[in-house]
Amino acid sequence: MWKLYGHDRAHDALRTALLARGFEENDPSTLMVAAVDTVLAALPAAVSGPLAARQLTTVRDLDAYQQIWDDVWPGAPNARYVNDYKSRIDQHDPGILFYAGFAPDGEAVTSGYMFHHPGDPIALLCGGTTKAAWRRQHAYTLMLAVRAQAAAKRGASHLAVEASPESQPILARLGFEPLSTLMFYEKHIAD
């Protein structure tokens, strides 16, 4: 996988080279940034509902994470990513934190993770994923809230998100502003 930002130098030449080497463009995203304090101030009225969020701290916890991804993106190489995440948890990597939101019956319905090393000014929020039946019920916002709170506790002053078109309006309401465009390039290699 390769990420190409709109502000990268030689953007057009890089894009041409990636396409010539068999990489395919995925859907475009937007890099959005906000001050942690701005997001936290906008959240109290936005987060409500029956879901309970918790940090995922064990390899077994990430099975729930994969269930969410498999439901939302069937056929995607979810196991490859989740196995990498399991390895990072097993190695006690302090730079990545995983969260999930659970319905009252215990079903994992939303998830997200955060890259942040304590002391860094920016935390990158990634993987915001919600099962279809739980959309428009503040599940995505709940995942934003728990990660923003964790980033604040770890000393981050700003949050960054590589936002899909679906996420951008939610993020804008919480104070995020677009900074650049982003395109993912992926080369499919046969197993």
Q: Locations of the language-model features?
A:
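Conserved active-site tyrosine of GNAT-family acetyltransferases
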Residues: L18, L171, F176
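A structural microfeature
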Residues: D27, A108-T110, S180
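Ligand-binding pocket scaffold of soluble enzyme catalytic domains
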Residues: R60, A64-Y65, F102, G119-I122, ...
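A conserved beta-strand-loop-helix scaffold within acyl/acetyltransferase catalytic domains
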Residues: P77-A133
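Short acidic/polar active-site loop segments enriched in Thr and Asp
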Residues: E24, S157, E177
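Conserved acetyl-CoA-binding loop-helix of GNAT-fold acetyltransferases
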Residues: T130, R136-Q149, K153, A163, ...
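Helix-loop element at the rim of GNAT/NAT acetyltransferase active sites that forms part
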Residues: Q67-R80
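Acyl-donor-binding surface of acyltransferase catalytic domains
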Residues: M1-R60, V161, S167, M183-K187
